[in-house]
Amino acid sequence: VVSAGLIAGDFVTVLQALPRSEHQVVAVAARDLRRAEEFARTHGIPKAYGSYEELAKDPDVEVAYIGTQHPQHKAAVLLFLAAGKAVLCEKPLGVNAAEVREMVAEARSRGLFLMEAIWTRCFPAVDALKSLLAQGALGDLRVARAEFGENLTQVLRSVDWAQAGGGLLDLGIYCVQFISMVFGGQKPEKISAVGRRYETGVDDTVTVLLQYPGGVHGSFTCSISSKLSNTCSVSGTKGIAQLLEPCWCPTELVVNKERKEFPLAPEENKKFNYRNGMGMSYEAQHVRDCLRKGLKESPVIPLAESQLLADILEEVRKAIGVTFPQDKH
């Protein structure tokens, strides 16, 4: 586990609730040894390291889970790939398209597994939606819509320009991945966007229109200063399907007013930092399945689609005039 932050804490809590014969957390690394040791004590992890390099050298580590801040993803991914490890990296995989391309090229050249942790795609409610679409239950598709907004202006990371904060990379990626998923991972023909910037220079609230081949389109809004409906929907000539709030970790799917529930495993006495934390188990099990099959990437979140999502988000940022220090000008 690379990082001793909040999301890493949730992931470890989930892994330890799964069978030990299938998942074992062998070590954690942070850039501050004290934090790593404290995290290891809290979660009962045998080894703690004060640098990522030491963790990369640990022969007991088969898979590295990277839960650092956005701008640290690339260096960490490249470090663990160079050490011959499989890598599951939190979204967004990179701050921009160039970073993502570099990581994907490295994984492919080394023949190692790399996956962007878009956990939403591993949820049973999303599987059910994909099945419906595959069966043509909604008829010919016409439009998809997604919204994700929370007031995160008190969360330092969310408004920090140097850390590539803002809504698009943190929340917008969930919206884009939904629209991309329902339209089969195609490249949009046209992207337009409007938005406002926060006083620190990150994007605050953004609305995006995506025109796809075949006359279908999608739109999404993401915001770090206002609460939105946090739902996703797709409509066709025979009806509408909606993932209810929280659509980034959904447990309810409504198809033409018929509601289906996909409850999570009970949390019992576990403490999570984020909503529906138990849902990270779907992602963990998916990575295990991929590795057992000898796959180098996930069929659910293929690397080509991670590249496409990064391309779209970068184009949106250009349209609204948001650049980060990690962007090459």
Curated annotation (Swiss-Prot):
Activity regulation details? Stimulated by various salts.
A Pfam family per the record: GFO_IDH_MocA_C3
Positions marked as site (May play an important role in catalytic activity): Y174
Q: Where is this site: May play an important role for the adaptation of the alcohol substrate into the binding site?
A: D170
Tissue specificity, per the record, is: Lens, liver and small intestine.
Which GO BP terms sit in this record? D-xylose catabolic process
Q: Which InterPro entries match?
A: Gfo/Idh/MocA-like_OxRdtase_N (IPR000683), Gfo/Idh/MocA_domain (IPR050984), GFO_IDH_MocA-like_dom (IPR055170), NAD(P)-bd_dom_sf (IPR036291)
Q: What is its EC number?
A: 1.3.1.20, 1.1.1.179
**Which keywords accompany this UniProt record?**
NADP, Oxidoreductase
Which residues does the UniProt site feature May play an important role in coenzyme binding point to?
Y65, H73, K91
Give one GO molecular function term.
Answer: trans-1,2-dihydrobenzene-1,2-diol dehydrogenase activity
Q: Which reaction does it catalyse?
A: (1R,2R)-1,2-dihydrobenzene-1,2-diol + NADP(+) = catechol + NADPH + H(+); D-xylose + NADP(+) = D-xylono-1,5-lactone + NADPH + H(+)
Q: Does the keyword NADP apply?
A: yes
**Subunit organization:** Homodimer.
Question: What family does the Swiss-Prot or TrEMBL record give for this protein?
Answer: Belongs to the Gfo/Idh/MocA family.
Q: What protein is this chain from? A: Trans-1,2-dihydrobenzene-1,2-diol dehydrogenase
Organism, scientific name: Oryctolagus cuniculus
